[in-house]
Amino acid sequence: MDEVSVIGCGNMGRSLIMGLARDGGFDVTGYDIDPEALAGVEGLCHPTDDLSVAAAAPTVVLAVKPTIVPVVLGELELGATQTLMTIAAGVERAYVQAHTPATVVRVMPNLAAEYGEMAAAVSWDAPDAGVQAILEAVGSYVEIDEALMDVATALNGSGPAFVYYLIEAMAARAGAAGMDPTDARVLATQTFKGAASTVAAADAPIESLIDAVCSPQGTTIEGMAVLRESAVAEELGDALDAAARRSAELAAEVDDV
C-alpha cells in the first residue's frame, strides 16, 4: 500500500482522506492539532497530532489554509527524497519549495475527492508517481502551467459551489411550480450528473450537444432562447474571475508573512 500523510483534516483534507480510504490502496496518516478534526477522520486513517509522525510518509499532502502554510512549513522537516503535495489555494510552488528540500507539487483539487469524482489541476516539474497515484484514486486530473493555477482554482476548486447554486435554482423553480422539493432536488441533481457524463463521453463540441436536445419548436429551444438572451454566461464568467482574483490575492498575502 502507498503511504500518504495529509496535514490538515479540515473539509478538503478530510475529503481526500475519505476518498483514499474508499479506494483502499493507501495507508494514510492524518495530522491536525484540532481534536474535533481528528475525530472526523477516525477509522479512515491513522490520526495524529504529532507533525513528525506525519512527516515520515514518502508523499505528504499540505492541506491547510493558505495563511497557515508558513507556520507549518516552519515546523515541517522533510527530506530530498520525499514529495510535498500542496493544495493550499493561492500558495505558489516556489514559495513552498523555498522552505523544504522535498520535491514540491502543486494541486488544486475539490471536495468530490470523497466520492472518487474529484477534478484536479496539477503543476510540477516532472510527473510524480506518488501524486499521480493519489489523483487517479480520487478522480481525474489535468497538467497545467502554474501561471494558470488561479484560473483552475476558480474553475474546478470553486466551481462545485457554482454548480450547487445552479442545481438549487433549478430545483427551487420546479418546487415553486408545485413539484415536491425532494423530487425536484433528485431530478435537478441527476440532470446535472447525466449531462456531465454525456459531455465527458462525447467528442463533439458542447454546442452540438445542446443543439441535439433542441428540437425545432420544442420546449428546450424555448428555454435556451431565454438563456442566450440573458447575461447568464457573463455572470458565470464574472464569478470565475472573482474567484481567480482572490486566489492571486492569497498568494500575495502569504508572501507578506
Task: Please place each PLM-identified region on the residue numbering.
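Small-residue helix-packing motif on alpha-helices
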Residues: 38, 54, 96, 180-187, ...
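Residues at the starts of beta-strands that form the adenosine-phosphate
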Residues: 3, 26-27, 83, 103, ...
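NAD(P)+-binding Rossmann beta1-loop-alpha1 motif at the extreme N-terminus of oxidoreductases
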Residues: 1-49, 55, 99, 117, ...
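Rossmann-fold NAD(P) dinucleotide-binding segment
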Residues: 49-102
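Internal alpha-helical scaffold of NAD(P)-dependent oxidoreductase catalytic cores
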Residues: 98-103, 119-152, 163-202, 246
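NAD(P)-dependent Rossmann-like dehydrogenase/reductase catalytic/cofactor-binding core
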Residues: 189-257
